[in-house]
Amino acid sequence: MAHVSLPHDAKAGPTKSEVRAVLLSKLDLTPTDHFAEVGSCTGAVTVEAARRAGRVTALERKPERVETSRKNLAANEVGGSVELRESEAPEGLPTDADALFLGGSRNYEAVLDHAVEHRIDRVVMNVSRLEVAGAATAAFRERGLLDEVVQFQVSHGYELAGATSFDSQNPVYMLVGGAGEVAADGGKAAMDDGGAATDGGETSTDGDERVRGTERSPGDSTGGGRR
C-alpha cells in the first residue's frame, strides 16, 4: 500500500490505514469509476481513492476541513481527478457515481436514498458506535442495499517489560452493498432472515444467521474508516 502523507490536521483522526485497506478492497475501484465520498475530513480516503478511480467527488460540510483535505491532496500530489465540494450530503452528491463511501452517520438515510435513486453500484459505510451500526444495518436492508456487515478491530503491538503487548483501537462496523449488480438481490444472498454478519463468512452479530464466505480479507487489498 502506497504511503499517504497527512501533514495537515483536521482536528479529527483520519481513517486508519488498516481500515482503509479493507474499505478499498470492498469498493474495488477501477480507473473507469467515479467515486463519491461523504465527509473527506483529512482527505486520507480521498487520496487513496484518487490513486485508483478515474474521478473522485468528495463532499465536506466544514470549510476548514475542505481546506485541510485540499492541502493533504497537494502534499500527496493528487490533482485534477478530484473535486472537493463544500456541501452537506445529500446536497452536492453526483448523480453518476459508481461507488460511494460514507465516513460518518450524519444524514445517512438521505444519502442511502440518493444511492438507491441513482443506482450506485457499490456503497460502503463506516460506523464506530454499536447503536448506529444496528440502525444503519436496518436502513441498508430496508432499501435493498445490504450485502454484508463486517466488524473488525485493529491492535498494534508495543514493547512492555521486555515483551510485546497490544494497544487495541475501537471496533469498526463496515456496511457493504449497493443498488447495482453488487446487491441486486437486496442482500438476500448474504443474509438469511435478518441481522448483521461479521467478518469471516460465518456467524452474525446476533448468532442466528450466516453470510456467504466470498468477501475478501484485508490481506487481499491493494491499498489501505474516520479519515
Task: Kindly label every feature range from the protein language model.
Residues 1-31, 36, 41, 67-74, ...:
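Class I SAM-dependent transferase core
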Residues 116-173, 225-226:
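C-terminal substrate-binding/active-site "lid" region of AdoMet-derived donor-dependent transferases
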Residues 162-194, 199, 206-227:
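Core SAM-dependent methyltransferase catalytic element
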Residues 97-104, 122:
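Short SAM/SAH-binding signature in class I
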Residues 55-60:
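Conserved SAM-binding motif I beta-strand of class I
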Residues 42-53:
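Conserved SAM-binding loop of SAM-dependent methyltransferases across substrates and taxa
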Residues 63-99:
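S-adenosyl-L-methionine
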Residues 107-115:
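A short, conserved alpha-helix within the catalytic core of class I
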